[in-house]
Amino acid sequence: MFIENFKVESPNVKYTESEIHSVYDYQTTELVHEEKNGTYQWTVKPKTVKYEFKTDVHVPKLGVMLVGWGGNNGSTLTGGVIANREGISWATKDKVQQANYFGSLTQASTIRVGSFNGEEIYAPFKSLLPMVNPDDVVFGGWDISGMNLADAMARAKVFDIDLQKQLRPYMESMVPLPGIYDPDFIAANQGSRANNVIKGTKKEQIDQIIKDIREFKEKNKVDKVVVLWTANTERYSNVVVGLNDTMENLFASVDRNEAEISPSTLYAIACILENVPFINGSPQNTFVPGLIDLAIKRNTLIGGDDFKSGQTKMKSVLVDFLVGAGIKPTSIVSYNHLGNNDGMNLSAPQTFRSKEISKSNVVDDMVSSNAILYEPGEHPDHVVVIKYVPYVGDSKRAMDEYTSEIFMGGKNTIVLHNTCEDSLLAAPIILDLVLLAELSTRIQLKAEGEGKFHSFHPVATILSYLTKAPLVPPGTPVVNALSKQRAMLENILRACVGLAPENNMILEYK
């Protein structure tokens, strides 16, 4: 059974006009390695920590500024939201299609809230806490190409022609602001698009981005802004002591106009200085140590890296299943070809290397979780190949071969072919990232014994489900298994309304 909304009635939850206040018993374990009777042994001790959560229920008017607004992802997301807001339908060769938000965790997935008369009851994910309605989001942003969004949509060739014709009047007047362009960080083949760039030193470029954010906020009368990078994949930046290893050194490097400070890092600096959440949707190391240092000291949300939309999402599910079933993956070979501008940019070795790192690390935590299967330091052979094939456009082909060892020396091979409509998969993920980033800025918590409420750590692990290479605070374990990431996100939001984590025990029927 499906219900549209619900309210929790519990002595641990209080609803007021301004907030939802919950008291939550967090049950976890601590491990102790101790000597007993002359030998060391591991002892697992269950413990309960009481937490309080406070969620501001005022839903702000949200502005979203995309870096790379005129790219395939930016034009697809903007057009998709307009189509939903306006209730647009269009003819395909199969049927009359209605606009929807399929592919969005917040808008098109459900959570289990309990059972009634022997039937499980589900509610929309977005009903857990008050969230921004995507139809109300105001879009803007930057792009090194000055093409308006209607023409960018046509260039992308993602939407059906009938839909493009209906969207064009809404999008013709949308023109990206000039963007930061540094040819050293992206493929040379992007130079022909760069007709809309911010001039000046790196310090002047940061100042211009700050000015742009303030003017966008004022012009559109939005309460909050979230900025997200959906522009070209950059090459990795060199992390050097004295250059970008601390906040102070990063600022000094900007003042010296050091060449190794990337455009994405400049956007992130501007956002942090404005206390605007910044999310990196590409695989490069935007968040150099000095930038993370700055975000922590300013307590400004940052998240990333790289949208998890197609092949990698499948991989984080399949390898988790195999290792969890006691099957040993020994070889993972992933081949991709695509024909959009992302593929064109990734044809350069230095930008491909960023993507290769992002895609290759996704199985690490699953492998390290099972020392029965893997010796210390042992790891599956893992190869990632990406090729640019212009004809296929945005329809990325992903082919994977998984070879595993099974019972008594046997071998098992799984081969997958996945046609990933790149931007149609990425656009709802971008939407989820900005909506959840905004929501998380309205949540405060404190553990028993802490005097004051505080926000989540600025490095937003809560967004991990949506990214290939989750950014985590220093010293925090990286979790890539998709089911664990979704459970973490859902259970944190459940805690905010005093609901227990979904453990699937269903003891009442045992």
Swiss-Prot record:
Cofactor: NAD(+)
Involved pathway(s): Polyol metabolism; myo-inositol biosynthesis; myo-inositol from D-glucose 6-phosphate: step 1/2
Disulfide bonds: none
Family from the record: Belongs to the myo-inositol 1-phosphate synthase family.
GO biological process, one term: phospholipid biosynthetic process
Molecular-function GO term, any one: inositol-3-phosphate synthase activity
This protein's GO CC annotations: cytoplasm; cytosol; nucleus
Enzymatic reactions: D-glucose 6-phosphate = 1D-myo-inositol 3-phosphate
Entry protein name: Inositol-3-phosphate synthase
Compartments it resides in: Cytoplasm, Cytosol; Nucleus
